[in-house]
Amino acid sequence: MNTSNKIALLIRHADRDDIPEGSFGNDVLLNQMGQVNAFNYGEKLKNQQITKIYSSPVPRCVQTAEFIGKGYGRTIEIIETVALGAPGLHINDEKIAGKYYLEHGFDIMYESFKNGTIIPGMATLESLNQNMNDFIHKHTNENETTIFITHDMLIAFYHFSINKTVYTKENWVNYLSGITFKNGVNER
């Protein structure tokens, strides 16, 4: 009988202030509410076995991991990886995709992705799905919960690639929310 229990939480970083128009916002840190919410998120996970958090190297994601660790109350290794941001597995060429993003905006990028249109510098739906599935599977430990902290764009694109989940302004990826996988199966 297999009693394995691999849980992966792919979540957006905690609350931040608005990103200045015309920028990527990589320097925007968590605000006070984000720090408190990340700490509280960690407290709620105390009954789970967590030893690692994988994080985008963007500072607000690393901060989120640190505050989750403080709330959890035990040592958690934080591993920064560009697979989750700066640029992330949804981006093949940061300069080309960044230029497209600044010229056209996120809404056009997301619509194009959902329609299967090739976006300059971005991964295809199929390659994003395969690369993220492989990354999460490789880094999720048996009988543990592993946390992956990233950005709303990667979550929205990846979730669509899994099961055509569409995020809108009304149901956008909230801070500290995302996709849960149990034994490799998407539960949300």
Which residue ranges define each predicted feature?
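Generic beta-sheet signal
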Residues: K6-L9, E142-D152
